[in-house]
Structure formats: C-alpha cells, structure tokens
Amino acid sequence: MDYLSLIKSPIHEELNDFVTLFNRSLSHDNGLLSRVLEHIRQRGGKRMRPMLTLLMAKNFGIVSEVTQYAAVGLELLHTASLVHDDVVDESNKRRGQASVNALFDNKVSVLVGDYILSTALLSVSYTNSELIVRYLSELGRTLSDGEILQLSNIDNTEISEEAYYEIIKKKTAVLFEMCAVIGAVSAGASDEEMAAARQFGQDLGIIFQIRDDIFDYYEETEVGKPTGNDMLEGKLTLPVIYALQSTGDEAMLALAHKVKQQEVNTAEIASLVAFTKAHGGIEYAEQQMAKRHAACMQFIDERVGDVAIKTALTAYLDYVIARKS
C-alpha cells in the first residue's frame, strides 16, 4: 500500500508550500555555510513530522501562515539536533549520505547546527504565538535532556522499562508530540483538543521508536541496518529488556551490563539477540505498539471528522508500524 500518497493527499499543496519555505530558510550567501546548508537540503527526507503538523492543523481548522512558520521551526530544530547528534555520536552517515561532520568537520557541524537552531527560533517568532514559542523551546530543552539522560544511563546499573520509556519519550516521542500539538494550536484548537493531540503525538512517537528498536534484531538485508547496532552503541531496548526481566537469566544480565559499558563483542551481541527472540521480546514489543495503536485510533475516531484527514492519519499510523527502515 502506498501509505505516503494517502498521507499527503489532503495536504499536497500545503506540503509544497512548507518545502518552499523550509528550503528558503536554509539558504545563505556565505560560501561555506551555503555549501553545508545545500548538503542538508539535498538529504530531504519523507517530511513525516511536518506532515503531522499540517494534518493536525487541517483537522482542527486550516493550515495558515502561522502553521507553516511553526512547521518550519519544528523541522529546523529537528535538523539542528541531528547535526549536533552526529558530532556527539561520531557518526559519519545520515540518511545514507555523509553527515555534515564527515564531509566537513566537527567545528563546522556545531556552528551550522547553532545557525539552524537560531533560524528555527526566528521562524517560530513569526507566528506571534507565545504558546507555540514556548512549546518549541520546551522541545529543544527536552531533546537535550534526553540525550544527556541516555549518556548518564550507561552508568546506571538498573535495567528497566521505566528508564527505557523515559529516554524515548524525551528523545523521540516529544518531537511527534510537539508537532501534533503545535499544529492544533496553530488552528485555534481548544485546550481539550490540544491535550488530545499532544497525547496522540506522544503515542505515535513511542510506536515509531519501538518499531525502530525492533529493526535491530533482524539482519541488515531485511531492514537496512546492521543487527545489534544499538547494543554496539551501549543501548538496551524494549525487546531485550523484557526478555531479561521475564527470565531473570543471570548470564544474559551480565552480558547486558557489558553492553551498557560498551565492552561487548559481536558474538555476545548475537547471543543476546537470539535470547531476546527466543523469549518473546519481539512479540512483547509489538504488543506495546498495538496498545498505543489502539489509543491513536481512538483519537482518530473521536477527534477527526473529515474523511480525507481520517484516512491520512490512519495511513500515517499504519506506515509507522509497517515501515522497513
């Protein structure tokens, strides 16, 4: 099924307007800055988060100039965070292409990330909405908090779902959460509608991250990324956390602690992956996605009246679960 076409259908023109405004925001006359920004623009992406903002605005009213400036601000903040993340993670790839730090260097990456972040703040200032500016500021702080929390979690001997959810809510889900609620705010939604949109976004973001985490337990040829990559980076995700907690296997718990200290080898990771699959870790993670899928569908059933928007948001939700990368 062509989920993306269904998602874009009711916001096709608005999405084109967004892309134009976003690209204009990432233009500059300075030679070096211009080259870096052009590299970032060329990476493109599916625009999943801006589409969520536009759909929410259209659901509760119209996509206005306020919506567009807010959506651009959100995407710019997200882009800046990715540029900085690649420096922190020492990553040389982003969406299959060379990262900014790989193509240029860390100094350029940090400075360009700062420039994009400042541009995000400028964009949302054009909304003249104190609430939208506040939400975007809250988002930036929460994303940073999530990154620091994940770093500090390496030294935390506790392995728990609670710690896992705290990190993914701050690192991933909050972005979907704010895209949804800011879209609603831009359309003049009521407090009750904004709260519902925010919860929908958080549930959607959690589903997105759990699906991403499940990819790590399959071969690269199946999902497009190497098996056990998260564990190589010291991350324990929901499937293995469940398998460890449900069995209490001491040998595997010892391996899990080695993962957190990044002292594990590929053979040990393969053992943990096999252990997770054998003890229902994948199935449990899928059950958790299903629970949040049901909550998202309740929002769509109760809060979305327009058939085209209902179809688009349902396709969005289905795409997040069905995607292979």
What positions do the PLM features span?
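All-alpha prenyltransferase/terpene-synthase fold signal
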Residues: 1-325
